[in-house]
C-alpha cells in the first residue's frame, strides 16, 4: 500500500511473502514451526495454572523479576541486562542505538530476513557478506574489512535459516 505519509524507510519495504503453504490435509508444516504432537499434560496444567494467576493483568512493564533472574543466572549487574517485549522490540532498539547511519551494517547474505527490514526502517545501509560454500559464516571475511568503515556487524548465531553456529572462539 502506498501513502504520502510513509517515511522513505517504510515506503521502500516490500510485504513479507511466506514460503510455500501446501494445502494437504494433516500435513505438518515444519517450516512454520508446526508440531505434530499435542501439548503435554504438564504444559496444559501450567497453562491452566497461569490462567488463574493474574494473567488478565498487565505484567510489570520493567520486568524486574525476570531481569534480576537473568542477571543473577549470568553473573551480571541488572544494568547489563536488557529485557524487551519479544525479539522484535529488542532488535529494533539495538539497531536504533548502535548502528551509525552514515556507515553500512555488515550481515550475512543468507540470514534472518528482518535484519534488512530494521536497517531500512532506521535508514541504515546494509552490506552483505556471502556465506562460504558450506553455508557457514566465515569470520575471516568480516575481519578483512576495515572496522572503521562499517557501523557494525549483525550475525544470528546459530544462523537463520541455515542453523549453523559459529564457535564462541570465532565470535
Q: What is the predicted function of each stretch?
A:
Residues 55-171:
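Conserved core of the PLP fold type I
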Residues 1-57, 152-155:
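N-terminal "arm"/small-domain region of PLP-dependent enzymes with the aminotransferase-like
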